[in-house]
């Protein structure tokens, strides 16, 4: 497993690891699930080429690097949860090469939690789909994609309508991914959201961060979509692994919320042609939450 320092493949050097995490920190299109899985994959590759001499600094670099990624992408609650898990499992290790194996086990376990969680979420979502359902979504959530694929596989899904999701236009990407998997999908302009809701049996959006009181931070456009669904009495579900849930409520005081949102926007991820890519959803606008534990009216902590 280990190599001499002179024999490291280029993709496992400290500079390459830092470069890969920097690229993830600047990624403005991928969802938190994709970012988290890619970060853990890079960490695993980096740690798998350790020596007795460098295992400790490498483990420290992984902990610090993923913490920094979570800070720079601080709209992503899942990355906060993953960073906390990495620090909890790896901090203090690295005194012997045996810690390389333990660190790898911890990283792989976190990856498995993410992958198995999405699989469990997809299976538990099936009762929410009426027969031959028309589903409505927006942006490009890997969780929503997995749920839709499973619903299609189990013959619960007829087709999907995806809002374009400007300013980033991630909805177009999701349509391509759905069609690649054989799912009938149509991209509609955001301005036609009302018409889209009129055709839908249910709506699904992926959360970026969920607070324990049920407040959600998600892509801009979700709030008017939720209002339209409420008006048309179309169920509106928010998907989010329990690792996305922050263990405290978000203040309802307007200035405190503005400050919280400004903290997200300050990293650059929240800026687009309209100056904002994220917005809050209040709990009373949602039919409920979908996690690896199934459907619930309130979010559950990991």
Model-derived features: positions:
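Long amphipathic alpha-helical segments
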Residues: 2-3, 8-104
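Short, glycine-rich nucleotide/cofactor-binding loops
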Residues: 14, 26-29, 134-140, 212-217
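Glycine/charged-rich beta-loop-alpha catalytic/anionic-binding loops adjacent to active sites
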Residues: 17-26, 64, 103-108, 156-160, ...
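Gly/Ser/Thr-rich loops at beta-strand to alpha-helix junctions
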Residues: 32-33, 134-144, 167-168
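Ligand-binding beta-strand-loop-alpha-helix segment within the catalytic cores
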Residues: 87-131, 144, 149, 159-203
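Histidine-anchored nucleotide/phosphate-binding helix
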Residues: 141-153, 226
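Conserved phosphate- and dinucleotide-binding cores of soluble alpha/beta proteins
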Residues: 157, 163-302
């Amino acid at each position: 497993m280990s190599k001499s320092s002179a024999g490291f493949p280029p993709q496992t050097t400290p500079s390459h690891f830092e470069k890969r995490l920097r690229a993830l920190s600047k990624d403005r299109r991928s969802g938190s699930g994709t970012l988290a899985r890619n970060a853990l994959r890079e960490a695993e590759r980096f740690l798998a080429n350790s020596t007795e001499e460098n295992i400790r600094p490498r483990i420290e670099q992984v902990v610090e690097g993923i913490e920094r990624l979570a800070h720079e992408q601080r709209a992503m609650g899942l990355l906060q949860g993953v960073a906390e898990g990495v620090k909890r499992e790896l901090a203090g290790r690295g005194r012997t090469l045996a810690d390389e194996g333990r660190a790898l086990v911890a990283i792989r376990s976190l990856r498995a939690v993410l992958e198995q969680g999405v699989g469990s979420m997809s299976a538990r979502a099936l009762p929410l789909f009426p027969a031959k359902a028309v589903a409505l979504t927006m942006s490009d959530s890997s969780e929503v994609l997995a749920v839709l694929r499973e619903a299609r596989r189990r013959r619960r899904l007829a087709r999907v309508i995806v809002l374009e999701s400007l300013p980033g236009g991630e909805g177009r990407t999701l349509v391509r991914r759905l069609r690649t998997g054989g799912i009938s999908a149509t991209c509609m302009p955001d301005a036609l959201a009302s018409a889209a809701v009129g055709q839908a049996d249910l709506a699904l959006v992926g959360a970026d961060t969920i607070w324990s009181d049920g407040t959600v931070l998600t892509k801009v456009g979700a709030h008017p979509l939720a209002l339209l669904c409420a008006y048309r009495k179309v169920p509106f579900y928010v998907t989010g692994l329990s690792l996305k849930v922050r263990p405290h409520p978000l203040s309802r005081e307007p200035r405190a919320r503005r400050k919280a949102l400004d903290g997200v926007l300050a990293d650059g991820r929240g800026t687009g042609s309209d100056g904002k890519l994220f917005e809050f959803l209040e709990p009373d606008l949602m039919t409920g939450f979908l996690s690896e534990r199934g459907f619930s009216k309130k979010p559950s902590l990991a």
